[in-house]
């Protein structure tokens, strides 16, 4: 009986050692798995921090771009308003010059019919500066004096400059 009890005890001891070894291997495997998962977790957390930093930098860069584009848009609007104002000024000058040209054309036609002599061909001349001054005569309020200053140019060069006084031009 004693041998049988010793055999049973040895068998139980062997089974307990085997079970202990199995548990130790399971603990080691689970410890390795936990360590691997911790490494994966740390790697993922590091990637997440890097992505958050990249996102913050991209967000800041995008905000800077938005601010720059808004400034560029405002500058373009200001420049367009300036150009529009300059264009309007040029249109006003053009209208004034058109009126002045029409006035001089009428004056020349009236002078031409009054003198009844043909005028030289002015088609190749440019009138650069003209000035019309109406001066009331002190002696009579019904007579007018007209001063016509004409500068004839060709290709930007002054060819002739003249001033004419006319009394009672109507």
UniProtKB/Swiss-Prot annotation:
SUPFAM superfamilies: Intermediate filament protein, coiled coil region. One of the most prominent phosphoproteins in various cells of mesenchymal origin. Phosphorylation is enhanced during cell division, at which time vimentin filaments are significantly reorganized. Keywords: Coiled coil, Intermediate filament. One of its GO terms (molecular function) is structural constituent of cytoskeleton. Residues 112-170 are annotated as: Tail. Belongs to the intermediate filament family. This is Vimentin A1. It comes from Carassius auratus (Goldfish).
